[in-house]
C-alpha cells in the first residue's frame, strides 16, 4: 500500500512538472525576419517545428533594403520590424522572446533547454557572442574583458523578456540599411544601459553558436537518435546554430544532420518529405524535360552514353534535346545518333564544333532554352563523361522535388566524385568530414552541398524565379562548373546531392587516346566498367559460373567472351593499320626472325595494344582457365598475341602444328556462313573438329604437348581470329 502511495505521489509530481514546463514554454515566442521564403527559411521552420517552437515571421513580402538578404551587412530593417512587432508584447512580463536570423539558422534543441539556459544566465537579455568584432574594430577597447569565452556581441541571435527587448529597441531611429549590430553594440558598451536593461553575452556558447571564427571549435555530436553541435572549446551544446558571415556553407553541412535529419540509427529521416510521385501518371502528362548534353573534350564510350540516354525510362516525346559538341573528333558520332534517334524527341538543337561556342556560353544557352519556355518543367544537364547506368535516374531525381539536385557519381575505384562537401577559404575544394562516407555509401541520404558538377536537374520554375537574372556559368575568372555553383549559392538556392541509389559513375578522361580508329579499345585500364560493358559478352558471367562452357573436343573449352562490337572493332582496327605479314617463315617481328608455322597476321604490339590485351587476358581469361584446368594458375604472360586473316586466295588454312604455349586462346572475330565459308580447327590426335566457330566465342586448349591441330581451309570470304599463346 505504501509503495502504491509513493508511486501515485511521484506520478502527480511528474504531471505537475510537465504542466509547469508546458506553461513555461507557452511563454516563449520566436521572432525572425524573412522577406521571402527561401530554402534556408524553410529549413529554419522545419527545425523549429521539430521542437514545437512558436514562430512569427516578420517582413514577409517586403523588399530587402540591403544587398545580400537579412543575414548580410546592414540589418537596420530587422530592428525596425522587431520594434514594431514588440509593441503588442511590451507589457507581457513573463513572455520570453527569442529573436534570430532564419536563412542561416537551425535549432539543435527545444524550448525547455533554451529557457533553462536563459534563466541560468540571470539576465533580462542575452546576446550571442562572437570571436570577431564587427563592424567597428575601434570599439574593441571598450568591451569588458572576458576571462573565458567569446568577447564580442553578435546581433544574429538574442533572447530576453518582452519588456526588456522593447526597451532595447526603443531608441532605434536609424535607416533600414544601417547596421543593427553596431546599434546593439553601442547599447551594450554603455555601462548604464547595459546594467539598466540587464544585458549579458553568451560567452561560452551555451545558447547560441555563431560559426564565424569558430569553425574549428564545432563538431557534430551523434547521440542516440539525435544530433547536436558540440563546442569543443567550452564543452557546450548550443541550442541555436547560426552560420553568420562567411560560414553559411557550414550551417548547410550541419543542417544535413541537426537536429535529427540524419542519424546512424535512423539514416535519413527527411528524404521522403515533399516527394513528387510520378506513379500512375501517363506519358503525356509527365513533366517536360530539356536534356542538355555537353561534349566538351574527347570522351571515351560516347556510343554507350547515347545508348544509356535512349534507355532512360522516360518518354522521349516528353524530352527535348540540346547538344553542345565542342569536339570535331565526335562530330560523326553525334550526327549519326541524331539521324537515327533525333526524331524520337520532342525537339532537337545541336551546336557543333564549327560554331566554336565556348563551354560557358553553351551551358548558358541550354539553361536559357528552358528558362524562356514556360512549358519546360525541368532542365537536365548531363556531361558526356557521365555513365548514367540507372535507367530510372531522371524519374528518381524529379521525384525528390528539389530546385537543384545531382545524383552521386564517382570514378571507378577512387574517391573522385561530382560533388564537394566543403569549400576552402579561396572557394576551391575542401574535404568535409562526411565526404568519404557519402562517396562510399556508408551515409545515404539527400545532402545540401556547396558544389556539384557533371550532371544535375534544375526546376524550370527556379530558372524563371530565383535564377532568372543570372548569367549562371560566368563568375569572375572561375571555370563554368564553379561559376554555376557560386551563382546558385549567391541566390540562396540550395544544391542537393542524392546517393540514395546507384546512378552510375564518371569516366576518367585523363589518358584517353585519339590516335586510333577505335580508341575505346585502349580504355581497359582507365574505365574498366565501361570497357567490360562494351566489349565483354553479356553471357561471360554464365561461363565463369560454369553454366555456359562447352567441350567440343577433349580438353578443348568453348565459351562466350567478346561482344559483336569488340570483334568488329578489333578487325577494323587491324585492317586500318593494314600492315599484314607476308605469311612466310622469315619474320623479323619475333625473336630469332624465323616463324615455323607462319600466318598472315598483325601482332598486338604492332598497334601498341599488348598492355591492354594482357589486361584482358588477366581479367577475363585467367579466371576461366583456373576453373577449367583445376590446379593451374596463370598470370597470362605471352610473347605472341595476334589477329590472323584467312582468305582463299591468300592463306586459306594452316598446316598441323603445336602452339608455343601452355594453353592457347582462339577467338572467332566474324561469323561463318555470313562473312566466310569453311574454316574451323581440327585436333588431329582426337580426330575432332570445330567447324562452325561462333563470333565472339573463344576456344581454349592446351598448347605445345597434347593438342596437335590444324586450321581448316576457308573456302569463301575472309575469316579473322584473335590468337594468344599464353604462358609460352
Swiss-Prot record:
Matching Pfam families: 2OG-FeII_Oxy, GT_PLOD, OGFOD2-like
Subcellular location: Rough endoplasmic reticulum membrane
Gene Ontology terms for molecular function: ferrous iron binding; L-ascorbic acid binding; peptide binding; procollagen-lysine 5-dioxygenase activity
PROSITE patterns in alphabetical order: FE2OG_OXY, LYS_HYDROXYLASE
GO BP term, example: cellular response to hormone stimulus
Reactions the enzyme catalyzes: L-lysyl-[collagen] + 2-oxoglutarate + O2 = (5R)-5-hydroxy-L-lysyl-[collagen] + succinate + CO2
Protein name: Procollagen-lysine,2-oxoglutarate 5-dioxygenase 1
Species in which this protein is naturally found: Rattus norvegicus
Classification of source organism: Eukaryota, Metazoa, Chordata, Craniata, Vertebrata
Gene transcribed to yield this protein: Plod1
Amino acid at each position: 500500500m505504501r509503495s502504491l502511495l509513493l508511486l501515485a505521489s511521484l506520478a502527480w509530481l511528474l504531471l505537475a512538472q510537465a504542466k509547469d514546463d508546458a506553461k513555461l514554454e507557452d511563454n516563449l515566442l520566436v521572432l525572425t525576419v524573412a522577406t521571402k521564403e527561401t530554402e534556408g527559411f524553410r529549413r529554419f521552420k522545419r527545425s523549429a517545428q521539430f521542437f514545437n517552437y512558436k514562430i512569427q515571421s516578420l517582413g514577409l513580402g517586403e523588399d530587402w533594403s540591403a544587398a545580400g538578404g537579412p543575414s548580410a551587412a546592414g540589418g537596420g530593417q530587422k530592428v525596425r520590424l522587431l520594434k514594431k512587432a514588440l509593441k503588442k508584447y511590451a507589457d507581457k512580463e513573463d513572455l520570453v522572446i527569442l529573436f534570430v536570423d532564419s536563412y542561416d539558422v537551425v535549432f539543435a534543441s527545444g524550448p525547455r533547454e533554451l529557457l533553462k539556459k536563459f534563466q541560468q544566465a540571470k539576465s533580462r537579455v542575452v546576446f550571442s557572442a562572437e570571436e570577431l568584432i564587427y563592424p567597428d574594430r575601434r570599439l574593441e577597447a571598450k568591451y569588458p574583458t572576458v576571462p573565458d569565452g567569446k568577447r564580442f556581441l553578435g546581433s544574429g541571435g538574442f533572447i530576453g523578456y518582452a519588456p526588456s527587448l522593447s526597451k532595447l529597441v526603443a531608441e532605434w531611429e536609424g535607416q533600414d540599411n544601417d547596421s543593427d549590430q553596431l546599434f546593439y553594440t553601442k547599447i551594450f558598451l554603455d555601462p548604464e544601459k547595459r546594467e539598466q536593461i540587464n544585458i549579458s553575452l553568451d560567452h561560452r556558447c551555451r545558447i547560441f553558436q555563431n560559426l564565424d571564427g569558430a569553425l574549428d571549435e564545432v563538431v557534430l555530436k551523434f547521440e542516440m537518435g539525435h544530433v547536436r553541435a558540440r563546442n569543443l572549446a567550452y564543452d557546450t551544446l548550443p541550442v541555436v546554430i547560426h552560420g553568420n558571415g562567411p560560414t553559411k556553407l557550414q550551417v548547410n553541412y550541419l543542417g544535413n544532420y541537426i537536429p535529427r535529419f540524419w542519424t546512424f540509427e535512423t539514416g535519413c529521416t527527411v528524404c521522403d518529405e515533399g516527394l513528387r510521385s510520378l506513379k500512375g501518371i501517363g506519358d503525356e502528362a509527365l513533366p517536360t524535360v530539356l536534356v542538355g548534353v555537353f561534349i566538351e573534350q574527347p570522351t571515351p564510350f560516347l556510343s554507350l552514353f547515347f545508348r544509356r540516354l535512349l534507355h532512360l525510362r522516360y518518354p522521349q516525346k516528353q524530352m527535348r534535346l540540346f547538344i553542345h559538341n565542342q569536339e570535331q573528333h565526335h562530330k560523326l558520332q553525334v550526327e549519326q545518333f541524331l539521324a537515327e534517334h533525333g526524331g524520337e524527341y520532342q525537339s532537337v538543337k545541336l551546336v557543333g564544333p564549327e560554331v566554336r561556342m565556348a563551354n560557358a556560353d553553351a551551358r548558358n544557352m541550354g539553361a536559357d532554352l528552358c528558362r524562356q519556355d514556360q512549358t519546360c518543367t525541368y532542365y537536365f544537364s548531363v556531361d558526356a563523361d557521365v555513365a548514367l547506368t540507372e535507367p530510372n535516374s531522371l524519374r528518381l531525381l524529379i521525384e525528390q522535388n528539389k530546385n537543384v539536385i545531382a545524383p552521386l557519381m564517382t570514378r571507378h575505384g577512387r574517391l573522385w566524385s561530382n560533388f564537394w562537401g566543403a569549400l576552402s577559404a579561396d572557394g576551391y575544394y575542401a574535404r568535409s568530414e562526411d565526404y568519404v562516407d557519402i562517396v562510399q555509401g556508408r551515409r545515404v541520404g539527400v545532402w545540401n552541398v556547396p558544389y556539384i558538377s557533371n550532371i544535375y536537374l534544375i526546376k524550370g520554375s527556379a530558372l524563371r524565379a530565383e535564377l532568372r537574372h543570372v548569367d549562371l556559368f560566368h563568375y569572375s575568372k572561375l571555370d563554368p562548373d564553379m561559376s554555376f555553383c557560386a551563382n546558385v549559392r549567391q541566390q540562396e538556392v540550395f544544391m542537393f546531392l542524392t546517393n540514395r541509389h546507384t546512378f552510375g559513375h564518371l569516366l576518367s578522361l585523363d589518358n584517353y587516346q585519339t590516335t586510333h580508329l577505335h580508341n575505346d579499345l585502349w580504355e581497359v585500364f582507365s574505365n574498366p566498367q565501361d570497357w567490360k560493358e562494351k566489349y565483354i559478352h553479356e553471357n561471360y558471367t554464365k561461363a565463369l559460373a560454369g553454366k555456359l562452357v562447352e567441350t567440343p573436343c577433349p580438353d578443348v573449352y568453348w565459351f562466350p567472351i567478346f561482344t559483336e562490337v569488340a570483334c568488329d572493332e578489333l578487325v577494323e582496327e587491324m585492317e586500318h593499320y593494314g600492315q599484314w605479314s607476308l605469311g612466310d617463315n622469315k619474320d623479323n617481328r619475333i625473336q630469332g626472325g624465323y616463324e615455323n608455322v607462319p600466318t598472315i597476321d598483325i601482332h598486338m604490339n604492332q598497334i601498341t595494344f599488348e598492355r591492354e590485351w594482357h589486361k584482358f587476358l588477366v581479367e577475363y581469361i585467367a579466371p576461366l582457365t583456373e576453373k577449367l584446368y583445376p590446379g593451374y594458375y596463370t598470370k597470362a604472360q605471352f610473347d605472341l598475341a595476334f589477329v590472323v586473316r584467312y582468305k582463299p586466295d591468300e592463306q586459306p588454312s594452316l598446316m598441323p602444328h603445336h602452339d608455343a604455349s601452355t594453353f592457347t586462346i582462339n577467338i572467332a572475330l566474324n561469323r561463318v556462313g555470313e562473312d566466310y565459308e569453311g574454316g574451323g580447327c581440327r585436333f588431329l590426335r582426337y580426330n575432332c573438329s570445330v567447324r562452325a566457330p561462333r563470333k565472339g566465342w573463344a576456344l581454349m586448349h592446351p598448347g605445345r604437348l597434347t593438342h596437335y591441330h590444324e586450321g581448316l581451309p576457308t573456302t569463301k570470304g575472309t575469316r579473322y581470329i584473335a590468337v594468344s599463346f599464353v604462358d609460352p
